[in-house]
Amino acid sequence: MKIIITTIILTLFSSLSFADGHTSGKFNASGMGAWKVNVMNAGKGDMVVTYDGIAGLADETPDSIFHKSTMQCIGGLTLQAGKFSDETGMCRFDLFDGESVYMKYEGEGTGGVGGTGTFEIIKGTGKYEKITGTGFSSRQNLKSKAPGFSTSMN
């Protein structure tokens, strides 16, 4: 059975509002990560992929809450003839100030090539408890030499 290693480049664009009600803004986070990948391969481009990984992020705006954060994402997708339209998952951003923000996402694309999707910020901890927002993400897959893992520039 062929092992497929999916590597993700995510560029996150969003608008969001903060729990204090006084601040809102946009973010554009990028970084690098590693993902543990599980694959059930049925052949001819048909397979299911699940992943769990972490990434370190920076934002082009240094005062963004997502600048110098990390994220853990767990998700999955089903490929049919090499394409997917059902990617779903959830991420937890661990922020520099010790708080966390959670988002869920959906996506579509082509296995081994990349994809696009949308996300919704659903909640946070502490001062970000009521944070909300939506955004767009895109990625380009890269190759990894570690079996069962993928690496990414997010």
Give the label of every model feature segment.
Residues 20-154:
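Beta-strand-enriched cores of mature, soluble protein domains
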